[in-house]
Regions:
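Sequence-level preference for short, compositionally simple segments enriched
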Residues: 19-23, 48, 67, 141, ...
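N-terminal helix-cap/turn-to-beta initiation motif at the start of protein domains
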Residues: 25-41
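C-terminal motif of bacterial Sec signal peptides marking the signal peptidase cleavage site
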Residues: 14-15
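A short, Trp-centered hydrophobic/proline-enriched beta-strand micro-motif
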Residues: 38-46, 153
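Amphipathic hydrophobic-ligand
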Residues: 55-61, 134-139, 163-165
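Sec-dependent signal peptide recognition
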Residues: 2-7
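Glycine-rich, aromatic-bearing surface loops/beta-hairpins
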Residues: 140-174
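Central antiparallel beta-sheet cores of small beta-barrel/beta-sandwich binding domains
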Residues: 45, 49-130
């Protein structure tokens, strides 16, 4: 019983650690305005790592965004190194200077986005196809602008609060 209580307290303590927040970047530059950066053509290259850090897949992607003044329509085409091709269309609405909401056909509910300084955080649950079934994976997705053309993306993927994979992506705007 003492071991169980000790383990519970350790898990509780780990869960209470300070996580990175979008507002941590509010005074940093360059400022990432996601609807500007993703408007037009953007190329991306990424690697998917399993929970132990092993690279399991790689991709190249083409993104094309159109901003109408209040919403961004973002078309993504992923070409994976195993031959799989995936497409996704995001509709991202700007709520105010710092807050966004997004939807896509394989996103459960609504994604929440937060933009401060060079950082954009996107939180959502994605239906990921695995062996013929869709499983719900929670994404903690961060994009960091490096300069006017280059941004780096890190996404942590979890199931039941446990990390199952990480995604690293480099974006280059045409």
């Amino acid at each position: 019983m003492k071991k169980f209580i000790g383990l519970f307290l350790l898990i509780l303590l780990i869960g209470c650690t300070n996580k990175m927040k979008p507002t941590d970047f509010k005074d940093q530059k360059p400022r990432l305005v996601i609807e500007n950066y993703l408007s037009g053509n953007v190329k991306a290259w990424g690697v998917l790592q399993n929970r132990s850090g092993k690279v399991t897949r790689q991709f190249k992607a083409d993104l094309n965004g159109k901003w109408d003044g209040s919403k961004l329509i973002l078309d993504e085409v992923f070409n994976w190194n195993d031959g799989e091709r995936q497409t996704r269309q995001w509709t991202i609405n700007k709520l105010d200077e710092h807050n966004y909401e997004g939807t896509a056909s394989d996103v459960v509910g609504t994604a929440k986005g937060y933009s401060y300084g060079p950082a954009f955080k996107f939180e959502y649950v994605l239906l990921v196809p695995v062996k013929g079934k869709n499983i719900k994976i929670t994404f903690d997705d961060w994009i960091f602008m490096q300069d006017e053309r280059v941004a780096i993306n890190r996404a942590t993927m979890t199931k039941f609060g446990i990390k199952v994979a990480e995604l690293t992506v480099m974006f280059v705007k045409d």
